[in-house]
């Protein structure tokens, strides 16, 4: 048994312009090689493009996209008796949001296009509408969990 206490859960800080935690989570996830100012630039340009495309609040589009992509359940590999099973597990809200952001960035990097801001804005708008690769990834994860429902007792 560990003598150390449990780690306190850190609350995500909000970004300077929109004062939103989701934007900050997105910035920290898009960050490469410590270039945070470039990450902020990319996110803010993407949000500006969303504003121009949809003529609505870009934060509501971002929130809608993340809620649409957030999975309720995922599969985890668990070794039982010499064979590995994909065991479905429920996901908490924080972990679900983190997965959703990761999938949105993965899908936007895969997209053809001029720059990351353009690709990210397109993916966010598509995800808010209920289409796009990130939504497909969520549905695929849910299908995997449904297919392996028989192994749920291995939790």
From Swiss-Prot:
Its main location: plastid. Coiled coil: none annotated. Keywords: Chloroplast, Plastid, Ribonucleoprotein, Ribosomal protein, RNA-binding, rRNA-binding. Disulfide bonds: none annotated. GO terms for cellular component: chloroplast; small ribosomal subunit. It holds the Pfam family Ribosomal_S7. One of its GO terms (biological process) is translation. It is found in: Plastid, Chloroplast. CDD domains: uS7_Chloroplast. Belongs to the universal ribosomal protein uS7 family. Part of the 30S ribosomal subunit. This is Small ribosomal subunit protein uS7c. It comes from Hydrastis canadensis (Goldenseal).
């Amino acid at each position: 048994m560990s003598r150390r206490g449990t780690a306190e859960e850190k609350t995500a800080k909000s970004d300077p312009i929109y004062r939103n935690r989701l934007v900050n989570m997105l910035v920290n996830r898009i960050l490469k090689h410590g270039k945070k100012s470039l990450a902020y630039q990319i996110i803010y340009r993407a949000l500006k493009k969303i504003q121009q495309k949809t003529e609505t609040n870009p934060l509501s589009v971002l929130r809608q996209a993340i809620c649409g992509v957030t999975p309720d359940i995922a599969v985890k590999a668990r070794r039982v008796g010499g064979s590995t099973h994909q065991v479905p597990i429920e996901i908490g809200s924080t972990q679900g949001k983190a997965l959703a952001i990761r999938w949105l960035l993965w899908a936007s990097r895969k997209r053809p296009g001029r720059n990351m801001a353009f690709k990210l804005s397109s993916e966010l708008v598509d995800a808010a509408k209920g289409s796009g690769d990130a939504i497909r990834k969520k549905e695929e994860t849910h299908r995997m969990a449904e297919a392996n429902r028989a192994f749920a007792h291995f939790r």
